[in-house]
Amino acid sequence: MIQMQTYLTIADNTGGKLAQCIKVLGGSKRRYAKIGDIITIVVKQAIPNSSVKKGDVCKAVIIRTSKEVRRKNGTYVRFDDNACVILDANLSPRGKRVFGPVARELRDANFMKVVSLASEVI
């Protein structure tokens, strides 16, 4: 579960390392976001000479959460960190690589490009 002020790691090769959630998209009263939801982030740490700079505001999709997610078959899946992938205006990933595993729930959220870039789908 991600809410405003939550820090996330950026799991792509755009150059951003750490991000902070500043808005959960999907309604004015919406408080929490889960895997596959789109949020607005601000980049807090970035490597030099990268496509995103510190202070950039952009949209991102959540690919991993430390809070467990219940699946239809009764199993739970959780990860070690909260992570996101930066999106462009067309809601496709801005980077060309995705680091670490991603959850299978991204397929249901129609983020097939992110799933295809990931090395492992759990």
Swiss-Prot record:
One of the GO biological process terms: translation
GO CC terms in record: cytosolic large ribosomal subunit
Source taxon at top rank: Bacteria
CDD domains: Ribosomal_uL14
GO molecular function: large ribosomal subunit rRNA binding; structural constituent of ribosome
Family membership noted in the UniProt record: Belongs to the universal ribosomal protein uL14 family.
Annotated function: Binds to 23S rRNA. Forms part of two intersubunit bridges in the 70S ribosome.
HAMAP family recorded: Ribosomal_uL14
Oligomeric form and interacting partners: Part of the 50S ribosomal subunit. Forms a cluster with proteins L3 and L19. In the 70S ribosome, L14 and L19 interact and together make contacts with the 16S rRNA in bridges B5 and B8.
This protein's name: Large ribosomal subunit protein uL14
Species assigned in the record: Borrelia garinii subsp. bavariensis (strain ATCC BAA-2496 / DSM 23469 / PBi) (Borreliella bavariensis)
